[in-house]
């Protein structure tokens, strides 16, 4: 089975994405506040951490997103493809109003692809397949 994943930036409503990065690693952090050993708030996706292969030296879009504190929309897409059939199992993580609050550049000496970017993202809304999570702390109104 082949496993392909990408970080894409663009318009989720139209499905048009202008920038695509190869995803190496992804962590979705979920949380809900609890009181007296019981949850007392709705679940929210607290943050998304991704590692992507660093693009060429002329593509500074990810650094500019971090430095300018702009909001972006896009998605993380995971494709699990079987070599024996044409079926594709897909998981989709869409984000709206996302900001990059942490940016790291990593260099690895002993592997084929040596340069990576690690991003931490917080978004006003994250939808995983058909389940939506709103993060009130990420919006400007909070």
Task: Annotate the PLM regions.
Residues 1-142:
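Glycine-rich, low-complexity intrinsically disordered segments
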């Amino acid at each position: 089975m082949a496993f392909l994943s990408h970080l894409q930036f663009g318009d989720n409503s139209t499905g048009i994405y202008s920038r695509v990065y190869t995803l190496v690693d992804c962590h979705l952090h979920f949380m809900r506040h609890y009181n007296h050993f019981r949850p007392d708030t709705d679940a929210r996706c607290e943050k998304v951490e991704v590692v992507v292969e660093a693009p060429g030296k002329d593509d500074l879009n990810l650094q500019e997103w971090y430095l300018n504190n702009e909001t972006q929309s896009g998605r993380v897409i995971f494709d699990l493809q079987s070599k024996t059939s044409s079926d594709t199992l897909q998981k989709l993580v869409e984000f709206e109003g996302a900001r990059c609050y942490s940016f790291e550049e990593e260099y690895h000496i002993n592997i084929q692809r040596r340069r990576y970017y690690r991003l931490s993202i917080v978004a006003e809304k994250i939808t995983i397949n058909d389940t939506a999570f709103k993060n009130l702390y990420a919006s400007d109104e909070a």
